[in-house]
Each structure stands twice: as structure tokens, then as C-alpha cells.
Amino acid sequence: PQGALVADALNLPFVYVRSTPKDHGLENLIEGELRPGMKVVVVEDLISTGGSSLKAVEAIRRDGCEVIGMVAAYTYGFPIAEKAFKDAKVPLVTLTNYEAVMEVALRTGYIEEEDVLTLNEWRKDPAHWEAGK
């Protein structure tokens, strides 16, 4: 939905990239008008590992378009994502990130310093993290 709002506000075309092709009809992965040579900015809500976002980039590039960057509302800033975006040569700009949210949450008393330490441990390796260890 964010991409549609941005496209509407800027009076630009909008396309939607599915995670998997439809299993009926034309079986499109990309819905909307995308022509070779178009310059595209991908709009996302959240970047975690970057996997699904970069699959969308690959699909758009396969259709002959140039992805000039990606914007997102939020990123956890996981090292795996930062490396993936660098390797894919996709500039990423976000409205906010993990560090900013932690700072505001701590400053406003929403969380305590101990919570920040726990969350920072989780952030180091979220796939293998276990609470209380």
C-alpha cells in the first residue's frame, strides 16, 4: 500500500511485484505497466533480511528496467541485509531504523535499559536467539 500512495502522490505509474507468480490467469509476477528501460524505485514498509525485497528487484531487472534504489519505512539494520543490498547494488533509504526506535523507546520510558540490552542481543542473531539465555 505504501508504494501505491507514493506513486499516487507523485503522479507516477505503480506496479506490484508478487512473491510468487499467480497460479491462474496470466501467471504474472509483476502486475501493472512496466516497460523495458523504465527507472524504478521500489517502496517497502519493512526491511529485515532484504530477501523478499531483493527478489522484487531481480524480477524488475529481468523485465529490462533499472532499479535506481529502494525506500522503506523501517529497517532493523541487520548486517545480512546491508550486505545483500550492497552486493545487489541497490541503494536503500529508510525513514527510520532500529537504533532510532530504541533511542526513543528508552528516552520516553517505553522500555528500560535492560530491555535494550536484550533486544540488542536478539538483533545480533535473531534466527538463533532464545530469550533468557
Model-identified regions with their sequence ranges:
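Short, glycine/charge-rich flexible loops or terminal/linker lids adjacent to PRPP-binding catalytic cores
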Residues: 2-41, 49-55
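Short, well-ordered alpha-helical microsegments
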Residues: 1-3, 78-79
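A contiguous pocket-lining binding segment that forms or flanks enzyme active sites
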Residues: 33-77
